[in-house]
């Protein structure tokens, strides 16, 4: 197989599930702008890079994706059929510039009525979270044009009061603060690009559930170029990989939680 020439390269911490699924989100959006886009993970010594080949001739496709997201006001709206879901924190939404529906949190792994990956509640609704995070992302982009570079896209932070909790680098432990910042609307330094793009990536690319370990999941950084249609197979390891990673969903209370740091899954 001939590896295509990438025109997007993102530094990614493979131990960070939020960054991993944000990469999946980038591939999802690139594929909608430039059908046939392919992506893969690679390692350069201790660093991992997510490559995307869009084959579109654009001089900066990553900036084009970020512009599409940040220029939309609002970025998300409630889906047309949202009234069928009575709970505000479960209502499906649409990413307006891409007409992409997000409702993965309604799809459980087992017999429940919501996904085990849903880690928000109450006022932290998908619509409110994504629009609030996008406001923060716009502020970051305003400060300098180089804030859209792949070397730092997932690491730039801004204080926000609405987030999902996909990025463990921004997560608060209840034992440290004594209360839930999400419930109290306390601003938390958050990487908006990671949170938004992970929410998008999880619509199609979901981690595998680890049996007999409650709220533990696994993902695989795939090493071969894949289009978005087959990326879900890459996530669960049906392709050449750079290894397998397992991570917990850490619940601070019965409603709020976050993705924990991943580690190499030795039993894979």
What are these model-predicted stretches?
Residues 1-140, 144:
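Early compact domain cores of eukaryotic multidomain regulators
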Residues 2, 6, 10-20, 24, ...:
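Elongated scaffolding segments in large macromolecular assemblies
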Residues 36, 42, 106-107, 122, ...:
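Intrinsic disorder/low-complexity segments enriched in polar/charged and small flexible residues
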Residues 120-125, 132-151, 170-210:
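Extended amphipathic alpha-helical scaffold segments
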Residues 153-159:
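Extended amphipathic alpha-helical repeat scaffolds
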Residues 159-173:
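Active-site-adjacent bridging/hinge elements
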């Amino acid at each position: 197989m001939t590896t295509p020439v990438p025109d997007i390269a993102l530094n990614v911490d493979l131990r960070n599930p939020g960054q991993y699924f944000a990469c999946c989100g980038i591939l999802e959006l690139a594929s909608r702008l430039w059908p046939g886009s392919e992506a893969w993970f690679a390692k350069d010594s201790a660093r991992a890079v997510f490559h995307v080949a869009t084959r579109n001739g654009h001089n900066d496709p990553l900036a084009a994706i970020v512009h599409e997201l940040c220029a939309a006001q609002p970025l998300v709206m409630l889906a047309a059929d949202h009234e069928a879901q009575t709970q505000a924190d479960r209502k499906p939404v649409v990413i307006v510039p891409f007409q992409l529906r997000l409702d993965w949190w309604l799809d459980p792994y087992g017999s429940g009525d919501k996904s085990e990956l849903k880690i928000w509640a109450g006022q932290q609704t998908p619509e409110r979270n994504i629009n609030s995070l996008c406001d923060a992302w716009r502020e970051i982009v305003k400060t300098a044009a180089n804030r859209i570079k792949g070397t730092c896209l997932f690491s730039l932070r801004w204080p926000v009061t609405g987030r999902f909790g996909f990025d463990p680098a921004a997560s608060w432990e209840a034992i440290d603060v004594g209360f839930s910042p999400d419930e109290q609307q306390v601003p938390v330094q958050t990487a908006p690009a990671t949170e938004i793009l992970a929410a998008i990536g999880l619509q199609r690319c979901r981690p595998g559930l680890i049996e007999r370990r409650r709220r533990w999941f696994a993902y695989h950084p795939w090493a071969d170029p894949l289009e978005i249609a087959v990326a879900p197979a890459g996530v669960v390891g049906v392709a050449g990989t750079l290894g397998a990673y397992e991570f917990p969903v850490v619940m601070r209370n019965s409603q709020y939680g976050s993705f924990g740091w991943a580690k190499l899954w030795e039993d894979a």
